[in-house]
């Protein structure tokens, strides 16, 4: 039988299905309702509440192949990936589980039977470990399985006792290991199970016997219904069955390495030289599955871990000479290998590729500068005789150039240095403290401490503004500057708290109301309303007339025309959200919004600019809902009922047990606390103004409605009229006239290119006269005239053809930058010459970077004055390359 990775997974699930287990699909890598976990990292994660007794399932036996990621948090294998034969950030955990059904006897029997009868592993090579005092498990291995006592080892709590946490279910475990042979023996004096961790003794399967409950005092009492939790790494067991020395040599990972070989034009080696290949092969699996499960690159949380993984892989791609986005090209290989078992990665393949490519492009923008800065930092440390890169410098790389700490550590390690992690963390905390201090400033008048005190004294403000825009109330507090006062006269800037108010306080992206507060002869002109300390509606304004006093009876009047304009834009925002999902896909989620009387701004998850067709379809969908005059219904219900009805809950928002639902016909339904229209027809018209990228995987749309939309159309009409006047054509002919002018410009540019090409040919004869010979190889290294990289490459091709055999190193100044090209003929590449390394060496001198293939490469620099030095540096390296 051929044991492909997919076949092993299938055999495992089918075997346990035959033993009465229900095959349960892998849970998402993003744990559901478990804030203690960054990612799913074991098969039992999705059954945690079942083991704890909080959840009932319709089965007592289950089997899974669980997607797992261990990178970040308590379980972090990132640093060891690629260095060992068996560590990964992404892996699959095969597992079988019993929830109070069978226990040790069947768990051990099933595992042994699967490994020996189904997989055919040699019984005389298998070992078992048990917990020190687990006599029951020891006896089962010896008497039921027939394993010699010499191959059953008792180990301590560190190796053979498992606990879900400091308290709760726990119990001993039993591991199954295989002896892979004397040839893999390590150099330790005593190479044995429990004594070393070498590749000879490979742990295959861990059987956890949950039989105790540990309380706060550490006392363990037997569970009434003991359970089983087992885990076996698919990659590990497949490596054993395929008789290969490393997980990376299995058919689960080797095709990924082969594809990287094609990308970089280098051959993979199983020793340290293959380290970058293994990192990339592992990391592309993590990236593919994390993005499929909804994780997007960001600067915090899960998104930051994803960004670290992806950027680390890109960095090792550069080590292999890949100086362009490439990770996204490997995604289809992952899908081909794993799409049958995990169809969702096939469904989201295009989406995943887009996310990865965009993130790669963003990283490349900063990587060149960052690598140069990092090299300078390392050189300075070495020059001063040090061996530690200061934490502040590592933080600069992180904060300014987007280098994760582990990337700085990799760079340092390659240069024989370490990173001051404590200093890095101190710099990070200092930045956080600055951010906290900034949040605590008094931009809103009084400091947060005063608002917290007032909230405690007065209680939260009652908001009455959903159904009306005016109402009577009582002044509960007046603040001027940062001090509570009892009264304030004309001209004084104040912040006023009322017992109840119709003024909406800024929240959920909707800005606060403005209007008037009238108390007899005193008037406060309210310019803004904000929610402070989580419960106070604070009216920011100026006393326009009279003396305003605490305890006054007031009439609060919201500026109703402004409120209506805000409501137009807020209701249109809901329609926009729905339209984006319809046109672009369900991956679209709101990431932020701003609703003002003048316009709306909507941030959403998407990974490419809108096409003109998408733009038009989104705008049409919004206006279709407007013209359909859909009723806007607002009601309160429970959070569970709202979700059951299909209401959209915004990611990252916190909701109580009771929520407010805004429904617009059968088109849109969202949880929202803002103010809205009564009917979508009141929007009038919606026009999109702009769409742009604001971050990795985030886009922003701005739009206007109602009177603002009319004003926008009038402006556009006036612009067209002025253009028509300047171009001396009717308005309807403006685009045709512009097309004609552009065509004329392109023709002039083409003529210019032809002229430059002829000039280049004249240069070639002069350049060839300057060729020289180095170690028997014809070499032409020269400064040339070429306006851009395309022209320089064209010149290189012509010169290479003329040379027949040899090496070219050309440099040209283009504005304030330097373009560099290196090329070598096939026969010279065979003598050890690598154009990519030559051009990289030259670029360093000019303050730039680049690289490429052995036969052709290009680079750029920032210092034209160093071009001659750069060419000499490349020639010097060339001398050492030629064999």
UniProtKB/Swiss-Prot annotation:
Record's keyword annotation contains DNA-binding: no
Molecular function GO labels: alanine-tRNA ligase activity; aminoacyl-tRNA deacylase activity; ATP binding; catalytic activity, acting on a protein; transferase activity; tRNA binding; zinc ion binding
Keywords from the named record: Aminoacyl-tRNA synthetase, ATP-binding, Cytoplasm, Ligase, Metal-binding, Nucleotide-binding, Protein biosynthesis, RNA-binding, tRNA-binding, Zinc
Keyword Transferase: no
Binding note for cofactor: Binds 1 zinc ion per subunit.
Domain of life: Bacteria
SMART domains, sorted: tRNA_SAD (SM00863)
Domain topic, free-text comment: Consists of three domains; the N-terminal catalytic domain, the editing domain and the C-terminal C-Ala domain. The editing domain removes incorrectly charged amino acids, while the C-Ala domain, along with tRNA(Ala), serves as a bridge to cooperatively bring together the editing and aminoacylation centers thus stimulating deacylation of misacylated tRNAs.
Name of the protein this chain belongs to: Alanine--tRNA ligase
Species, as recorded: Heliobacterium modesticaldum (strain ATCC 51547 / Ice1)
């Amino acid at each position: 039988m051929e044991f492909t990775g997919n076949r092993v997974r299938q055999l495992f699930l089918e075997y346990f299905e035959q033993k009465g287990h229900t095959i349960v699909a892998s849970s998402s890598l993003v744990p559901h309702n478990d804030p203690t976990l960054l990612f799913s990292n074991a098969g039992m994660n999705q059954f945690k509440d079942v083991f704890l007794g909080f959840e009932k399932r319709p089965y007592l036996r289950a089997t899974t192949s669980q997607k797992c990621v261990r990178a970040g948090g308590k379980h972090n294998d990132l640093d060891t990936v690629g260095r060992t034969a068996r560590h990964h950030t992404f892996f699959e955990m095969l597992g079988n589980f019993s929830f109070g059904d069978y226990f040790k006897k069947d768990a051990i029997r099933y595992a042994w039977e699967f490994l020996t009868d189904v997989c055919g592993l040699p019984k005389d090579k298998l070992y078992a470990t048990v917990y020190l005092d687990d006599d029951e498990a020891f006896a089962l291995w010896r008497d039921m399985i027939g394993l010699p006592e010499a191959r059953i080892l008792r180990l301590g709590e560190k190796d053979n006792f498992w606990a879900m946490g400091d308290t709760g279910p726990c119990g001993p475990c039993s591991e199954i290991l295989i002896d892979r042979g004397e040839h893999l023996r390590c150099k330790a004096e005593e190479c044995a199970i429990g004594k070393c961790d070498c590749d000879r003794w490979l742990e295959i399967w861990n059987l956890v016997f949950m039989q105790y409950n540990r309380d706060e005092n550490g006392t363990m009492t037997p569970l009434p219904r003991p359970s089983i939790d087992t885990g076996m790494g698919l990659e590990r067991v497949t490596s054993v069955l395929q008789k290969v020395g490393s997980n990376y040599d299995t058919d689960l990972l080797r095709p990924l390495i082969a594809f990287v070989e094609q990308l970089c034009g280098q051959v993979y080696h199983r020793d340290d030289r293959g380290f970058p290949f293994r990192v990339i092969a592992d990391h592309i699996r993590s990236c593919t599955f994390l993005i499929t499960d909804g994780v997007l690159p960001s600067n915090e949380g899960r998104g930051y871990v994803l960004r670290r993984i992806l950027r680390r892989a890109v960095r090792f791609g550069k080590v292999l000479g890949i100086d362009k986005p490439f990770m996204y090209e490997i995604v289809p290989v992952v899908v081909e290998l794993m799409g049958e078992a995990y169809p969702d990665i096939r469904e989201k393949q295009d989406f995943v590729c887009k996310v990865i490519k965009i993130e790669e492009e963003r990283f490349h923008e900063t990587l060149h500068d960052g690598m140069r800065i990092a090299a300078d930092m390392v050189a300075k440390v070495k020059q001063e005789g040090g061996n530690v890169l200061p934490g502040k410098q590592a933080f600069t790389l992180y904060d300014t150039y987007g280098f994760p700490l582990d990337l700085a550590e990799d760079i340092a390690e390659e240069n024989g240095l370490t990173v001051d992690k404590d200093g890095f963390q101190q710099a990070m905390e200092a930045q956080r403290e600055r951010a906290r201090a900034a949040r605590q400033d008094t931009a809103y008048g009084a400091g947060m401490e005063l608002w917290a005190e007032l909230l405690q004294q007065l209680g939260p403000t009652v908001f009455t503004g959903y159904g009306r825009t005016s109402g009577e109330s009582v002044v509960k507090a007046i603040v001027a500057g940062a001090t509570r006062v009892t009264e304030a006269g004309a001209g004084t800037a104040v912040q006023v708290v009322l017992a109840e108010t119709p003024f909406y306080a800024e929240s959920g992206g909707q800005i606060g109301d403005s209007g008037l507060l009238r108390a007899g002869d005193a008037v406060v002109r309210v310019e803004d309303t904000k929610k402070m300390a989580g419960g106070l509606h604070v009216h920011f304004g100026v006393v326009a007339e009279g003396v305003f006093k605490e305890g006054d009876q007031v009439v609060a009047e919201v500026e109703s025309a402004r409120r209506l304009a805000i409501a137009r834009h807020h209701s249109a925002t809901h329609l926009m959200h729905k339209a984006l999902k319809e046109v672009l896909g369900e991956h679209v989620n709101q990431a932020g919004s701003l609703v003002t009387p003048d316009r709306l701004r909507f941030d959403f998850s998407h990974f490419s600019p809108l096409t003109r067709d998408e733009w038009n379809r989104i705008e049409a969908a919004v206006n279709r809902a407007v013209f359909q005059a859909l009723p806007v219904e607002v009601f309160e219900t429970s959070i569970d009922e709202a979700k059951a009805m299909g209401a959209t809950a915004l990611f990252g928002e916190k909701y109580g047990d009771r929520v407010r639902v805004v429904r617009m016909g059968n088109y849109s339904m969202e949880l929202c606390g803002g103010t809205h229209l009564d009917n979508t027809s009141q929007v009038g018209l919606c026009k999109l103004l702009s769409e742009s990228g604001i971050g990795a995987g985030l886009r922003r749309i701005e739009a206007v409605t109602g009177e603002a939309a009319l004003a926008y159309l009038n402006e556009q009409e006036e612009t067209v009229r002025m253009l028509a006047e300047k171009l001396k054509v009717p308005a309807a002919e403006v685009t045709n006239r512009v097309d004609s002018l552009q065509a004329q410009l392109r023709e002039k540019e083409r003529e210019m290119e032809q002229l430059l090409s002829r000039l280049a040919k004249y240069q070639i004869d002069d350049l060839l006269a300057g060729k020289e010979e180095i170690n028997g190889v014809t070499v032409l290294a020269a400064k040339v005239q070429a306006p851009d990289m395309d022209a320089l490459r064209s010149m290189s091709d012509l010169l290479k053809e003329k040379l027949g055999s040899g090496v070219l190193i050309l440099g040209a100044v283009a504005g304030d930058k330097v373009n560099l090209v290196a090329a070598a003929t096939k026969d010279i590449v065979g003598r050890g010459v690598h154009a990519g390394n030559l051009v990289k060496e030259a670029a360093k001198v000019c303050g730039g970077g680049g690289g490429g293939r052995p036969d052709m490469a290009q680079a750029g620099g920032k210092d034209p004055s160093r071009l001659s030095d750069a060419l000499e540096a490349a020639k010097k390296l060339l001398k050492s390359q030629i064999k």
